Structure formats: structure tokens, C-alpha cells
Amino acid sequence: MALEGVLKEGFVTTTADQLINWTRNGSLWPMTFGLACCAVEMMHAGASRYDLDRFGVVFRPSPRQSDLMIVAGTLCNKMAPALRKVYDQMPEPRWVISMGSCANGGGYYHNSYSVVRGCDRIVPVDIYVPGCPPTAEALIYGIIQLQSKIARTSTIARKA
């Protein structure tokens, strides 16, 4: 009713970019890539106390159904090709959240010969969530930041 009072003509005007981004913003489907203890906090964020479903986040079991990858934990050299392969299987548009110090830059194992010093060397990362391990609140804040980033992006190519 409040909307009808504001819109006297009975219609809403918007751009296609805003409409598309609004739908993408409210329906992120992450594919979890849990590698270490950060994955426990990611599961905690999806449980009943924090309930990521209220933000439109629904965890999917397949990369072909996902548009968001959450890399949580230490990425080893042997796991890096698998990470890239799963990322390549995701449809466009796709986003990546790097969760935890180990995924961000190697963390405690930074000087180890077998650790990739940041998953951004393998896949492009949109949001970094710091912490060891980051709390569920930090992951939720990262998801909210990603939603605002999606709302600002242009989805339709404009010709000059």
C-alpha cells in the first residue's frame, strides 16, 4: 500500500542493470570449497543461528549450479588445479570470496613449500574475509559486501 501511494501512475521505472543486479543480489548460490578449519565457520554461518538463507544464500552441491565460490582454508599446491577446474565449471557471472588468512595469503603456513600464498594466484577474488579462522559474522559481512558490489556493477554492455 505504501508503494501505491508513492506511485500515482501505478508503474515503476528502472534500468535493466538495476533489475538484473537486484535479482542476482538476492539469490547468491555459493559452492563451498572448504579446505581447513575455516570451513567449520562457514558451516556455522549456514546453520540456524546465523541463517544465511535470509540473505538469499543457498548452498549448492555442484559448481554448475553456483555463482559464488567460498574458498575457506589452506590451499596446497596439489589442490590448486582442482580449484581452478571447479572455478572454470561455474557459469558466468561468478564471484569468489577468499575466507581466512590461509586462503588470503598463506596464513600460518605462508613459508611452507606446499602452500599457495593466496588463492588469488589461482582464481580472481572479489572479497577477502580476514581472520584465523574468521567468525561467522565476518563471513556474513563479506557476503553483504559482495551483494553491494554486485549492485554497483554494470551487466549490460553499452556502446559508446
From Swiss-Prot:
It comes from the Bacteria. The keyword Glycoprotein does not apply. GO terms for molecular function: 4 iron, 4 sulfur cluster binding; iron ion binding; NADH dehydrogenase (ubiquinone) activity; NADH:ubiquinone reductase (non-electrogenic) activity; quinone binding. Its EC number is 7.1.1.-. InterPro entries: NADH_UbQ_OxRdtase-like_20kDa, NADH_UQ_OxRdtase_20Kd_su. It is a peripheral membrane protein. Pfam families: Oxidored_q6 (PF01058). Its main location: membrane. It is found in: Cell membrane. It catalyses: a quinone + NADH + 5 H(+)(in) = a quinol + NAD(+) + 4 H(+)(out). [4Fe-4S] cluster binds at C37, C38, C102, C132. PROSITE patterns: COMPLEX1_20K. GO terms for biological process: aerobic respiration; electron transport coupled proton transport. GO terms for cellular component: plasma membrane; respiratory chain complex I. Keywords: 4Fe-4S, Cell membrane, Iron, Iron-sulfur, Membrane, Metal-binding, NAD, Quinone, Translocase, Transport, Ubiquinone. Its cofactor is [4Fe-4S] cluster. Binds 1 [4Fe-4S] cluster. NDH-1 is composed of 14 different subunits. Subunits NuoB, C, D, E, F, and G constitute the peripheral sector of the complex. Belongs to the complex I 20 kDa subunit family. HAMAP family: NDH1_NuoB. NDH-1 shuttles electrons from NADH, via FMN and iron-sulfur (Fe-S) centers, to quinones in the respiratory chain. Couples the redox reaction to proton translocation (for every two electrons transferred, four hydrogen ions are translocated across the cytoplasmic membrane), and thus conserves the redox energy in a proton gradient. This is NADH-quinone oxidoreductase subunit B. The lineage of its organism: Bacteria, Pseudomonadati, Pseudomonadota, Betaproteobacteria, Burkholderiales.
